[in-house]
Amino acid sequence: MEKEESTEQRKQARLAIMELANMISVPMALNAVVRLNVADAIWQGGANNPLSAAEILPRLLPAGGGDAENLQRLLRMLASYGVFYEHLSAGERKYSLTDVGKTLVTDEQGLSYAHYVLQHHQDALMRAWPMVHEAVVDPTKEPFERANGEPAYGYYLKHPEMNDLMVRAMSGVSVPFIRAMLEGYDGFQGVEKLVDVGGSGGDCLRMILEKHPTIKEGINFDLPEVVAKAPQIPFVTHVGGDMFKFIPQGDAIFMKWVLTTWTDEECKHIMQNCHKALPEGGKLIACEPVLPEDSDESHRTRALLEGDIFVMTIYRAKGKHRTEEQFRQLAIDAGFPRFRAFHVDHFYTVLEFQK
């Protein structure tokens, strides 16, 4: 019996390493169906009727041509990852969207997670991945910089099409999360002046002010070249500057996905500047990915750890996703005596640091 179990374990191990070695097929197949706009083609205004690859193809390529068999191969593989439902009848395979697949459907605002997928798989980012090991050998330069000659954010500014895609990607991810945050977190009660650090075009600040009309003034604070393109929003003032030098004063400061791309010392510096800008009792409200303590095999843990490696590879080799305890220590180091975490989403957590 022991020998049989050992043989089966070896078979399972070989199967597992084969899956890991071929796993690049998953994001590349996902990228392909996004580029082809498969989700919108199936969704068709909410119909989501099961369709064969041969039926989907003309919706993707109205002028004709294409290969339905190769499209089916992509759909079938992604069905095994829960992106599509596969309906098998009389030897014919048809596909509809799962809840995961529906996140790729363009909504009435032109948003979806599709841009997030595309942003992650641009050529400049893909060039960095074969160099991930260099982050272990020498963390002073990110794999992205090694592959492209300069850090990611500087590279984006020189390539407007990449920067525009990143902004659309962040909007597609931000809007559903902010909705969840506004439903599950009430920490904006009593705030009259709110500063959004790294607020980009001000979308999140606009949503917060619409939900909490008692906030009389919003400050959208970002780099000068970013806020220069920001649209006018009622009760919002766009302010350009550098968060490492100063942060505008407010009753509360909001930031999302800022701390994860900076080192511990840099985070401490940013948070100390927030501390200076807040009155006694004021709050820094940060939305960040928070790692679990245990490295289990759940979807949540894997998604968070994968995001951590993405940060290490593309943005900062020593920037990182952190555990709740690591954020608690940052709070102490930056002078915030009170810290609370609110789990309103499976990926992002609302962190409240009170002065």
From Swiss-Prot:
Q: Which InterPro entries match?
A: COMT-like, O_MeTrfase_dom, Plant_O-MeTrfase_dimerisation, SAM-dependent_MTases_sf, WH-like_DNA-bd_sf, WH_DNA-bd_sf
Give coiled-coil spans as residue ranges. none
Which E.C. number(s) belong to this protein?
A: 2.1.1.7
> Can you name one GO molecular function term for this protein?
nicotinate N-methyltransferase activity
Any Pfam family from its record, for instance, is: Methyltransf_2
Which top-rank group of organisms is this from? Eukaryota
Q: Which GO terms describe its biological process?
A: biosynthetic process; methylation; nicotinate metabolic process
Catalysed reactions, as listed in the record: nicotinate + S-adenosyl-L-methionine = N-methylnicotinate + S-adenosyl-L-homocysteine
The UniProt keywords, alphabetically, are: Methyltransferase, S-adenosyl-L-methionine, Transferase
- Name the residues that bind S-adenosyl-L-methionine: D222
- What this chain does, per the record? Involved in nicotinate detoxification in planta. Catalyzes the conversion of nicotinate to N-methylnicotinate, which is a detoxified form of endogenous nicotinate in planta.
For this chain, the family text in UniProt reads: Belongs to the class I-like SAM-binding methyltransferase superfamily. Cation-independent O-methyltransferase family.
Q: What is this protein called?
A: Nicotinate N-methyltransferase 1
To which species is this protein native?
Answer: Glycine max
Q: Lineage of this protein's species?
A: Eukaryota, Viridiplantae, Streptophyta, Embryophyta, Tracheophyta
Q: Which gene encodes it?
A: NANMT1
